[in-house]
C-alpha cells in the first residue's frame, strides 16, 4: 500500500544516514581496516531502524525493498554488480526468515537482521573475489600503486573470515539493542 511504501522510504533514508555515519566512523577510527569492517559497524548501529521497519510494516517485501534500494544506490555509485547481488539476495532471505515467524518472533526477526546485514558486504566482497577487476577499477579512477597497495594491505583469507564473523557479532548486538529500544522506548510512546 502507499502508506507502507512511504514508511519503507522513510526507514530506508534513515538506514542510509546511519550507513553514512558508519562509513565516516570506520574510515576515521579504524584506519586500514575501515572498509573491511564497515558492514560490521553499520550492523551495530542500524538495528533500531530495522526493528522499527519490521514492527511498522510487518509484511513481506519491506525488508527486500530496503535492501534492493541500497543495492541499486551502491551499483549506480560505481560499485561492482556483486554489491547489487548481495543487496538483493540477503534482504530477500531476511524477509523470508522474518515472514516465517509472521514478523512477530523475536528470534526470527533477530536472525533476519543478521542475514540482512550481510547484504552490505557486497561492496567489500570484490576485495577477495574480484581482486584484478578491483585493481583495474582503482587504476581507472587514477589511483596510484601505493594507494592500491594500502587498500589490499589487510586483504587475505584470514581477514575475510574475521570480517564475516565481526559482522555476525555486531549484527547480533545491534539487533538485540534495536529490539530492546523497540520494547523499552518506541512501544511505550506509541510509535509502534
Describe the role of every protein-language-model region.
Residues 5-10, 40-44, 63-68, 81-85, ...:
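Hydrophobic alpha-helical transmembrane segments
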Residues 22-30, 57, 61, 81, ...:
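Membrane-interfacial segments
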Residues 35, 110-183:
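Membrane-embedded alpha-helical hairpins and interfacial helices in multi-pass inner-membrane proteins
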Residues 86-116:
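Cytoplasmic juxtamembrane interface segments
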Residues 1-27, 138-143, 147-156, 162, ...:
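Membrane topogenic helices and adjacent juxtamembrane segments
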Residues 11-23, 46, 50, 74, ...:
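Alpha-helical transmembrane segments of multipass membrane proteins
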Amino acid at each position: 500500500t502507499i502508506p507502507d511504501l512511504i514508511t519503507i522510504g522513510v526507514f530506508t533514508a534513515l538506514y542510509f544516514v546511519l550507513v553514512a555515519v558508519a562509513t565516516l566512523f570506520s574510515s576515521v577510527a579504524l584506519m586500514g581496516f575501515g572498509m573491511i569492517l564497515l558492514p560490521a559497524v553499520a550492523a551495530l548501529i542500524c538495528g533500531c531502524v530495522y526493528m522499527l521497519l519490521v514492527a511498522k510494516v510487518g509484511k513481506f517485501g519491506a525488508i527486500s525493498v530496503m535492501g534492493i534500494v541500497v543495492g541499486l544506490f551502491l551499483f549506480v555509485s560505481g560499485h561492482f554488480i556483486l554489491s547489487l547481488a548481495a543487496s538483493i539476495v540477503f534482504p530477500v532471505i531476511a524477509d523470508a526468515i522474518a515472514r516465517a515467524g509472521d514478523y512477530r518472533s523475536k528470534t526470527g526477526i533477530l536472525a533476519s537482521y543478521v542475514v540482512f546485514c550481510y547484504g552490505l558486504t557486497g561492496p567489500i566482497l570484490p576485495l577477495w573475489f574480484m581482486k584484478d577487476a578491483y585493481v583495474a577499477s582503482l587504476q581507472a579512477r587514477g589511483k596510484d600503486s601505493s594507494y592500491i597497495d594500502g587498500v589490499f594491505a589487510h586483504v587475505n583469507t584470514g581477514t575475510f573470515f574475521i570480517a564475516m564473523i565481526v559482522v555476525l557479532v555486531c549484527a547480533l548486538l545491534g539487533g538485540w539493542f534495536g529490539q530492546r529500544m523497540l520494547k523499552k522506548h518506541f512501544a511505550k510512546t506509541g510509535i509502534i
